[in-house]
Amino acid sequence: MNKQRGTYSEVSLAQDPKRQQRKLKGNKSSISGTKQEIFQVELNLQNASSDHQGNDKTYHCKGLLPPPERLTAEVLGIICIVLMATVLKTIVLIPCIGVLEQNNFSLNRRMQKACDCGHCPEEWITYSNSCYYIGKERRTWEEGVCWPVLQRTLICFL
């Protein structure tokens, strides 16, 4: 829209408005009436269609970013928000992890002191801090009941 020209005219008529006619500057027809306001704009739009098709860098809204720059700004904004969330999460979680590690270490120590059981003898199986023996020898029932007492253990009936 390179060439724009506007003409503003106000027509005030005398007491007999039906008879008065006045020609406006730049207008070839006469107008009659009590009071009329006329706004004439002549636009020279010779290159208007070619301006919109060929010139993609001209934007009429100055407050908005063009699509490629806007997309880039949105992506960078999202990346910034994700990075800030990660940093904040790290700042909050690092002290918590340290406290949990200390608690875990002290709990393991207390369990080792409370359990204070030695290793199981050879051919015995450890399960849940207990030792189990599965014998392959043939014994009578009385021998099978007496054998754990001799070993200072308890018998488990299955």
UniProtKB/Swiss-Prot annotation:
GO terms for cellular component: external side of plasma membrane. Gene3D superfamilies: Mannose-Binding Protein A, subunit A, YojJ-like. The keyword Cell inner membrane does not apply. Residues 1-12 have a biased composition (Polar residues). It is a single-pass type II membrane protein. InterPro entries: C-type_lectin-like/link_sf (IPR016186), CTDL_fold (IPR016187), NKG2/CD94_NK_receptors (IPR050919). Residues 1-30 are annotated as: Disordered. Natural killer cells. The chain crosses the membrane at residues 75-95. Keywords: Disulfide bond, Membrane, Receptor, Signal-anchor, Transmembrane, Transmembrane helix. Residues 1-74 are cytoplasmic. Changing residue 151 to R: In allele NKG2-F*02, allele NKG2-F*03, allele NKG2-F*04 and allele NKG2-F*05. One of its GO terms (biological process) is stimulatory C-type lectin receptor signaling pathway. It is found in: Membrane. Residues 96-158 are extracellular. Changing residue 70 to K: In allele NKG2-F*02, allele NKG2-F*04 and allele NKG2-F*05. Changing residue 144 to R: In allele NKG2-F*02, allele NKG2-F*04 and allele NKG2-F*05. One of its GO terms (molecular function) is transmembrane signaling receptor activity. Can form disulfide-bonded heterodimer with CD94. May play a role as a receptor for the recognition of MHC class I HLA-E molecules by NK cells. This is NKG2-F type II integral membrane protein. The gene is KLRC4.
